[in-house]
UniProtKB/Swiss-Prot annotation:
Transmembrane segments: none annotated. It is found in: Cytoplasm. NCBIfam families: rRNA_mod_RlmN (TIGR00048). It comes from Streptococcus pneumoniae serotype 19F (strain G54). This is Probable dual-specificity RNA methyltransferase RlmN.
Amino acid sequence: MKPSIHSLAHQTMQEWVLEQGEKKFRADQIWEWLYRKRVQSFEEMTNLSKDLIAKLNDQFVVNPLKQRIVQESADGTVKYLFELPDGMLIETVLMCQHYGLSVCVTTQVGCNIGCTFCSSGLIKKQRDLNNGEIVAQIMLVQKYFDERGQDERVSHIVVMGIGEPFDNYNNVLNFFRTINDDKGMAIGARHITVSTSGLAHKIRDFADEGVQVNLAVSLHAPNNELRSSIMKINRAFPIEKLFAAIEYYIETTNRRVTFEYIMLNEVNDGVEQALELTELLKNIKKLSYVNLIPYNPVSEHDQYSRSPKERVLAFYDTLKKKGVNCVVRQEHGTDIDAACGQLRSNTMKRDRQKAVAAVNP
C-alpha cells in the first residue's frame, strides 16, 4: 500500500527529490501543486518531468481517502464519511463559523478511551492514522469548496474527531507541522486546537514542544468518583495527576487551556458540580476557559440524556458568578448524525445488516 504524498513534510520532500537526482526546488514545485493548486493527480503537475512524475506515481498516492457519504446540515455543517485504503471508515466535519471554515479531523480508527457517553468508542481502536491520512481529510474538505467554485479556504482546525490525538502523538505533531508550513496550507498554529481526554504525560510533552497550537482537555466531571464512572481514563490519570500536568503546561507556555464539559442530565450538570469545578480551577482561573457542550444523544448510550436549558443556564451562571470564563457551545449539524462517531457507527451497522441480508435473503 503506497503512502500518501501528504505524509512528507517539506524538508522530507526536499530530501526525497535530491535522492531522485533532482534539484531541491522541485520540492517547492510539488508542494505548490499539492497545497496551493490542490491537484488530484501527479499528471497535473505540468512543470515536472515525465520521469519525476513516474517516480511519484510509483512511490506515492495523492489522495488515500475515498468519499463514502456526505451529509449537509441546514446550518452549513457538512459531515463526511471517508474510507481508508484498508477499508476502515473515519469521519470528518466541516463547520461554518463566523470567523471562517473550521474542520474537525479524526486521528484514529476507533477509540480505546471508553467514555461511556460517546459513540466514537463503540468500536475499539483498530489503528492510528498516519500524518498523510489526517492531512488528506482537510484537502478533501477544501476540494468540496473548490469544485463548487466557492472562493473559501479552510482557516481553522480542531483535532477532536474519532480517537485520542495524544495516543497518536508523533503523527499528530507531524500533521501540525505540515498544515502550519508557510509553503503549504499555512494555517496558523493559533488557529489549530488539539483536544485530549487527559493523557497527563503527553500534556507535559506537548508543553515542552513549544508549539503555539491551542490545548483543550475533555474534563466532563469535577471529581474523581464521577469522572471515573464516565471516563475510564481517569483511573490511569486521576484529576490530581491531570491537573498537575495542566498546571505544568500553563507555567511552561503561559497559554490558556480550554476545558470541555459535556452536559449530561442529572449526572454532572448540577450546581453542586459547578461549584466543585470552580474550586478545581481556582489556581488557574485566569488561563482557563470552560466550554459547556450540549449532549447529542446516542442510542447505544440511552442511560444519558441532554441537560434541559434551565440546568445548563444554572450551571453556566454559577461558573460566571465565581469568575470562571465559560461559554455554552453553539451546536452544529443537529439535523444530521451530529454526535462524534455517529455517522460511522450507523453506517457500519447498516453495512452489517446488508451483509446479513445477503447471506440470509
